[in-house]
Amino acid sequence: MLKQFFFICIFFALVSHAQVAGTSIFSFLNTSTNARQTALGGKTLNLLDDVDQPTWNPATINSNLNKQISANYSSFLAGISIGSVSYAHNFSGIFKTFHSNITYVNYGEFIQADVDGNETGTFNASDIALALGTSYQIPNSHIYIGTSVKFIYSSIANFSSTGLALDFGAIYYNALKPYTFSLVMRNIGTQLSTFNGESENLPFEVAIGASYLPENLPLRWYLTVDNLQQWDISVPNPSNQTTDLDGNTTEEEISFIDNALRHFIIGAELFPKRAVNVRIGYNFRRGKELQLQNVRTFGGISFGFGLRMNKIKLNYAYSRFHSASNVSTFGLSIDLNKNRTEIAPTKY
């Protein structure tokens, strides 16, 4: 089974070479809106019991998510509001379960001025993405593949841009094993219309993930390695630059190991199957890029909790970006399936 999963990984790697590197538009697509995922470091790919997870890995769409709806909201940095709504529903046929999601970002109101700096009014900016996906089990295997299509709309004042993107995912899941493995390729697509006639790339990303639940320990571990399509993601931190007696400035030198670690996100969930659970995560890249010299800011750390009451789940996450920048994310999930009297075991 794992051999099949390996060949799927090879196929995804070949497809990824067709994507063009460089700056990108619609970067909000790579911002987590889910409170549970945010608490686990900001990016997980292996949550099988969360109706928001298919937004990041469509292979996790499964029949146990039927009639579950979730809403998340966060008052992000600089007064930006970001949120999402997800829903899954079962149908008959080879593609049994479909998943839908709406993600929005409201950047707020800005002062509009002419070339001389004279204020002429105000304008707004916002983003929205609509997604629909499904999954399929490869016959006689424990491998599941999924895909979703996204329509994207972005507006700044009187200018707007639209785009179309695809996500592909694969997951190895065996109910008798304590581990899962995932591979995703996200935001494969193009702009349908541009802001100023110049086409830009979408924020294409390749990532792998894993989870592990020890047999006698109620602590599930999560690991995500992101941005595999681009090895060097290092950005020198201005607070780590040095200046000599002549006033010459030297940027921070980032080592091979330092750059490698910036691809890693780790998380842990205590009592993952209980009514109350606690989560913590660490994003290495965020911690390094927002680090202050000689000051412990705890940037990159996130934590939160989940509370389940019958068919309602409440989630909260606290993300530490900087000593002056922290974000709280709230989530509410409701199981609308009246025939389900208890939480079913995770299965497809």
Where are these regions (language model features)?
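Positively charged n-region of N-terminal signal peptides that target proteins for export
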Residues: M1-Q4, N140-S141
